Regions:
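Active-site ligand-binding patch in enzyme domains
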Residues: 2-86, 90-201
Length: 201
């Protein structure tokens, strides 16, 4: 069974070992322990792929098949996440969307944050939701916060400017503004979206 605890351990290990050439998952009493040591029962991941040398629970197998090969690849991966109601809505009529996801979805979202180098949002997400964009529901590292704010409308009243963590804002505005713990990167207005994409990559 996938739990908040074991998926957190897996994500945290993958995060720390992104540059490693060899990863191992050792199974002990139908559970798994992550290490770089050779054991009898293990899953061996090398540059040629994933080799399973033992039985593994289906759910953990699925996690490993998706996440661990990513470690061995050099190209960037992008993960999109959206929460919506059963009838396809992402907010109430008054714009309130806190929280449209349940607790399990929130834990999953924070798990994704813990393995990502950065989280990218638009200015309206900050203005309407006032999020922290940090990893809190599980143990894990925080991603770099990147905000796309073309007209530089944000002010220091939002949470992301009050917790001491760093932010990067992309804008094409000429407005001079001092935002706490924030690096503001000005790009030309023409082809702004494409230029942001190129910088993120």
């Amino acid at each position: 069974m996938i739990t908040k605890h074991n998926i957190s351990n897996l994500f945290e290990f993958v995060k720390k070992q992104k540059k490693s050439n060899i990863l191992r998952i050792d199974l002990i009493n139908k559970s798994f322990v992550l290490s770089q040591h050779t054991k009898t029962n293990h899953i061996f991941i090398d540059k040629n792929g994933v080799n399973f040398n033992c039985k593994i629970e289906k759910q953990i197998n699925e996690i490993a098949q998706i996440l661990l090969p990513i470690v061995m690849m050099k190209k960037k991966f992008y993960i999109g996440q959206i929460g919506q109601s059963l009838d396809g809505k992402i907010a109430l009529l008054n714009g309130n969307s806190h929280y449209i996801n349940d607790k399990n979805s929130i834990s999953y979202l924070h798990s994704l944050r813990s393995i990502c180098d950065a989280v990218v949002v638009g200015v309206n997400t900050i203005k309407k939701d006032n999020p922290l964009l940090t990893t809190r529901a599980i143990k894990g590292s925080n991603p770099q916060r990147i905000i796309i704010d073309p007209s530089l409308k944000l002010t220091n009243k939002y949470q992301i400017f009050k917790d001491g963590l760093s932010n990067i804002i992309f804008t094409h505005s000429n407005i001079k503004k001092n935002l706490n713990n924030t690096k503001i990167l000005k790009l030309p207005e023409r082809n702004f979206t494409n230029l942001v994409y190129q910088h993120i990559n």
